Amino acid sequence: MAKGQSLQDPFLNALRRERVPVSIYLVNGIKLQGQIESFDQFVILLKNTVSQMVYKHAISTVVPSRPVSHHSNNAGGGASNNYHHGSNAQGSTAQQDSEETE
């Protein structure tokens, strides 16, 4: 369990700390938008006009509105190649291009 959260915790924490607006897509297709207020092992508190508790098992995708640096503790840098937002210059452009083609 700790290995799986070693990726999601720094990512979610960076989004929370920097107050980055996010779109959260649920497995049923619903899109939620807001800022991550807090999170734990099972839920994310998403704040917009109201706070919503979203269970992680219902989440398909978390999409930040801008690239976020969440690899500050990664000395090797190898794992960052697995993420679209690992490169600050290209991440948001690639995301916008993929959204336009849908």
Curated annotation (Swiss-Prot):
Keywords: RNA-binding, Stress response, Virulence
Residue ranges of the region described as Disordered: 63-102
Compositionally biased region (Low complexity): 70-88
CDD domains for the chain: Hfq (cd01716)
Tagged with keyword RNA-binding: yes
GO cellular-component term (any): cytosol
Residue intervals of the Sm domain: 9-68
GO molecular function terms attached to this record: identical protein binding; RNA binding
Outcome of gene disruption: Drastically decreases survival in host macrophages. Cells display drastically reduced virulence in vitro and in vivo. Mice infected with the deletion mutant show no signs of illness during the course of the experiment.
Pfam families named in the record: Hfq
GO BP field: regulation of DNA-templated transcription; regulation of RNA stability; regulation of translation, ncRNA-mediated
HAMAP family listed in its UniProt record: Hfq (MF_00436)
Miscellaneous comment text of the record: Hfq expression was decreased during the space flight and expression of 64 genes of the hfq regulon was altered. Likewise, several small RNAs that interact with hfq were differentially regulated during the flight.
Function in brief: RNA chaperone that binds small regulatory RNA (sRNAs) and mRNAs to facilitate mRNA translational regulation in response to envelope stress, environmental stress and changes in metabolite concentrations. Also binds with high specificity to tRNAs. Plays a central regulatory role in the microbial response to space flight conditions. Is essential for virulence and is required for efficient invasion of non-phagocytic cells.
Family, as annotated: Belongs to the Hfq family.
Subunit structure: Homohexamer.
Name the record gives this protein: RNA-binding protein Hfq
Biological classification of the source: Bacteria, Pseudomonadati, Pseudomonadota, Gammaproteobacteria, Enterobacterales
